[in-house]
A protein has these predicted regions:
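ABC-type ATPase nucleotide-binding domains, specifically the catalytic core motifs of the NBD
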Residues: 27, 109-124, 135, 248-249
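The feature captures the beta-strand-to-loop junction immediately N-terminal to the Walker
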Residues: 48-50
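Helix-to-loop junction immediately C-terminal to a conserved catalytic motif
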Residues: 63
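Conserved ABC transporter NBD signature motif
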Residues: 71-79, 91
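Conserved ABC ATPase "signature" region
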Residues: 123-141, 189-192
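Conserved ABC ATPase signature
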Residues: 145-149, 153
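Catalytic Walker B motif of ABC-type/P-loop ATPase nucleotide-binding domains
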Residues: 170-174
């Protein structure tokens, strides 16, 4: 764990989010086989696996873009696997996709516009907008059109907007993809700011080094199932995880 990254400590008493035996197939071909995991409030968890391992399918199943063939998805004690995307969002699931999902307006209005949909009091809308601009280092970009932002700046804006709906769980689909190493370190810092709000964080990635400095635990997907789980150091000792990434001939 890099010094200065951890913001709060999570309490591992009761999971805020659970996946139980989630299974998904396409045209009879299994993609996910009985996937199970728990997330706790304020915890940052990685979902690792090479391309084609099922990460994107699991991500889409959790947020409601597709439905599982079997299994349960539980948020704050309530089953949500049959709910569509908008109801899962309303229940407390926030998500950030790999697409550049911003409005064609200024950075300030990108945040304020969502605040206006979710907060009745105008003064509170303005206060939250300014707070998020400050916390995600966007004040100097407030009047810039979002379409003119760099990749890292867009990620910061998207992360800031996630917090407006007060999610209990945040899913981030490869948020550090195609970013320079120095920008990756910056985004890692802002991802962990979500913990200030008590969010449980699940981050997908296919690269170990993008996540291991910031996650508390990780799950590794391979062969349509979870082949390893644990702390970063435990994952690095897993023969199945090492073989998946480096091949059967690899030796530590």
């Amino acid at each position: 764990m890099k010094k200065g990254f951890r913001i709060i400590k999570f309490k591992k008493d009761k999971p805020v989010f659970q996946i139980k035996d989630v299974t998904k197939s396409y045209d009879g071909r299994p993609i996910l086989k009985k996937i199970s995991m728990n997330l706790y409030p304020g915890e940052c968890v990685g979902l690792l696996g090479p391309n084609g391992s099922g990460k994107s399918t699991l991500y889409s199943t959790i947020i409601g873009e597709i439905y599982a063939d079997a299994g349960k998805i539980i948020l704050k004690g309530k089953e949500i696997q049959d709910q569509p995307v908008h109801l899962r969002s309303k229940a407390g699931i926030g998500y950030l996709s790999q697409q550049r999902s911003v409005f064609d307006m200024s950075v300030h209005d990108n945040i304020l516009g969502i605040c206006q949909f979710t907060i009745k009091n105008v003064e509170d809308q303005i206060k939250l907008t300014e707070r998020l601009l400050d916390e995600f280092n966007l004040q100097h970009l407030r009047n810039i059109e979002a379409s003119n932002l760099s990749g890292g700046e867009v990620r910061r804006l998207m992360l800031a907007r996630l917090l407006i709906n007060k999610p209990s769980v945040v899913l981030l689909d490869e948020p550090m993809a195609a970013l320079d190493p120095i920008v990756v370190q910056d985004i890692q810092k802002y991802i962990l700011k979500l913990q200030n709000y008590g969010c449980a964080i699940l981050i997908t990635d296919h690269q170990f080094n993008n996540l291991f400095d910031i996650v508390d635990r990780a799950y590794v997907l391979g062969e349509q199932s979870i082949i390893a789980q644990g702390t970063p150091s435990e994952i690095l000792k897993s023969s199945k995880a090492i073989e998946l990434y480096f091949g059967p001939s690899y030796r530590t």
